[in-house]
């Protein structure tokens, strides 16, 4: 099986990568079948041989995750939605919904408490007013 992968080169701690097509059983920095591009993560420079990449992809070459990301950014393949991304978005949506329900519940409880307090204050005030208006019989 042919893989599209990154082949490391450069100084220590200053790596650059060549995008290569190679046999899936060969070493990371082994001899490639074909060099298809270049990627420098420090400067974000990317050069891709679009025609050769399309040819290799049509032949059934499988890109690694890092190469797939580069190809998506380069516009050579469509962005794929991975199952983990879908699950993550669903979890975030469920959490937001639960937080909204909790906030609405707390707001309703606070409103009910405020209404009960206002009602108690009004009853106490009317009771005080009724006691003051009644004539004192002695």
Swiss-Prot record:
Pfam families: Ribosomal_S16 (PF00886). InterPro entries: Ribosomal_bS16, Ribosomal_bS16_CS, Ribosomal_bS16_dom_sf. The keyword Calcium does not apply. Residues 92-138 are annotated as: Disordered. GO terms for cellular component: cytoplasm; small ribosomal subunit. Residues 94-122 have a biased composition (Basic and acidic residues). GO terms for molecular function: structural constituent of ribosome. GO terms for biological process: translation. Keywords: Ribonucleoprotein, Ribosomal protein. It comes from the Bacteria. Belongs to the bacterial ribosomal protein bS16 family. This is Small ribosomal subunit protein bS16. It comes from Synechococcus sp. (strain WH7803).
């Amino acid at each position: 099986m042919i893989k599209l992968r990154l082949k490391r080169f450069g100084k220590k701690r200053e790596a650059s990568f060549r995008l290569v097509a190679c046999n899936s059983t060969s070493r990371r920095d082994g001899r490639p079948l074909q060099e298809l591009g270049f990627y420098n993560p420090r400067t974000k420079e990317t050069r891709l041989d679009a025609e050769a990449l399309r040819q290799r992809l049509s032949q059934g070459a499988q890109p690694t995750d890092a190469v797939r990301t580069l190809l998506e950014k380069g516009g050579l393949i469509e962005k794929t939605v991975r199952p983990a991304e879908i699950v993550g978005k669903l979890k975030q949506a469920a959490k937001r919904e639960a937080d909204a329900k909790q906030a609405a519940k707390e707001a309703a409880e606070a409103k009910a408490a405020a209404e009960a307090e206002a009602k108690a204050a009004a009853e106490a005030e009317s009771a005080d007013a009724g006691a003051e208006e009644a004539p004192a019989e002695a």
